[in-house]
């Protein structure tokens, strides 16, 4: 810090035209990131005449390069062996630093101080982001659903940073904003677990999509679930009872058909037997009726009368 104060005291009125990004620099968690800072050097510029300091966020020590040498002894433990200049680029006016293995605690404002006969400073904002996992969706209840039932679709996603923006859409791509409950809890590493629940009245069939938006990384991950309510769906017990009753009814109909067939056969036999008896009786009566009459003479009749 004393070296930085000395650098500022030695500065002249005319400042170097330092250039840094206007927008925040985005660093991925556990990846390397470059914090840009550069100027256009004059002819004859050499790094031996250069002094560079980077003021690190929330740190008492700074990272510096003075008159051709790195200042490593005052480097913060948090940044030790993780931050460095591009020494081969210094002669081109490139004062950028490489920050390795970005951590969540690295987020903040970094200020670049440069002195070459005169001095200037510029600040760079670093934002850290970690992508969320692909969401998983769960349905409750998930069985024996029919239109009109109330169901809850729950979306889970993990290990993202910072907090996510959650959006629900139906199958037509329309945003759903009612009956939504969302919670975001950070773990011991500072990464967030997001749980969002959507309660809906089930229709015949619809698709629900959970979109997870990372505001720093500007990326979206999503998952969809199609839910169908069956009008004619039966519980397993009812289905088996229905099948059992159908089988019993079929057996009963078969038995009834056998009884009817037997009864019909017996009736036919009796009718045939009765018809045979009637025919026999008719034949007997006809035979008796057709017997010849005995013819007697007149004399025989007189003798018979005399005998009487």
From Swiss-Prot:
SS bond list: 37-112, 155-210
Coiled coil spans: none
Keyword Lipid metabolism recorded: no
Membrane-crossing residue ranges in chain numbering: 237-257
Gene3D superfamilies listed in its UniProt record: Immunoglobulins
PROSITE patterns: IG_LIKE
Cytoplasmic side: 258-308
One Pfam family linked to the record: V-set
Main location: membrane
Protein's membrane topology: Single-pass type I membrane protein
Top-rank lineage group of the source organism: Eukaryota
Residues in the signal sequence: 1-15
Domain Ig-like V-type: residue ranges: 21-125
Protein keywords: Disulfide bond, Immunoglobulin domain, Membrane, Repeat, Signal, Transmembrane, Transmembrane helix
Residue span of region Disordered: 270-308
Domain Ig-like C2-type: 135-228
One Gene Ontology term, aspect cellular component: external side of plasma membrane
Gene Ontology biological process terms in this record: regulation of cytokine production; T cell receptor signaling pathway
Recorded family membership: Belongs to the immunoglobulin superfamily. BTN/MOG family.
Function, in words: Modulates immune responses.
PANTHER family hit by this protein: BUTYROPHILIN (PTHR24100), CD276 ANTIGEN (PTHR24100:SF155)
Name of protein: CD276 antigen homolog
Organism: Xenopus laevis (African clawed frog)
């Amino acid at each position: 810090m004393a070296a930085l104060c000395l650098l500022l005291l030695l500065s002249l009125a005319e400042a170097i035209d330092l250039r840094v990004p206007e927008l925040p620099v985005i660093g991925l968690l556990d990846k390397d990131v470059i914090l840009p800072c550069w100027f256009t050097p004059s002819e004859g510029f050499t790094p031996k005449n250069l002094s560079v300091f980077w003021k690190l966020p929330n740190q008492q020590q700074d990272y510096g390069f003075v008159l051709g040498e790195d200042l490593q002894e005052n480097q913060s433990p948090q940044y030790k062996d993780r931050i460095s200049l591009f020494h081969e680029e210094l002669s081109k006016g490139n004062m950028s630093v490489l920050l390795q293995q970005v951590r969540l605690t690295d987020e903040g404002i970094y200020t670049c101080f440069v002195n070459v006969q005169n001095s200037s400073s510029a600040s760079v904002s670093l934002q850290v982001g970690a992508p969320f996992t692909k969401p998983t969706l769960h349905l409750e209840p998930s069985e024996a659903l029919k239109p009109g039932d109330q169901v809850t679709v729950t979306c889970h996603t993990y290990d993202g940073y910072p907090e996510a923006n959650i959006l629900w859409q139906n199958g037509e791509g329309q945003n759903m904003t009612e009956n939504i409950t969302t919670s975001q809890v950070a773990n011991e590493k500072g990464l967030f677990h997001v749980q969002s629940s959507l309660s809906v009245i089930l229709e015949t069939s619809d698709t629900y999509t959970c979109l997870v938006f990372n505001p720093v990384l500007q990326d979206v991950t999503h998952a969809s679930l199609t839910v169908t309510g069956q009008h004619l769906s039966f519980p397993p017990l009812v289905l088996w009872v229905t099948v059992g009753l159908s089988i019993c009814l079929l057996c009963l109909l078969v038995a009834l058909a056998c009884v009817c067939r037997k009864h019909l056969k017996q009736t036919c036999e009796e009718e045939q037997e009765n018809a045979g008896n009637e025919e026999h009786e008719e034949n007997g009566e006809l035979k008796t009726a057709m017997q010849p009459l005995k013819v007697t003479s007149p004399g025989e009749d007189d003798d018979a009368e005399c005998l009487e």
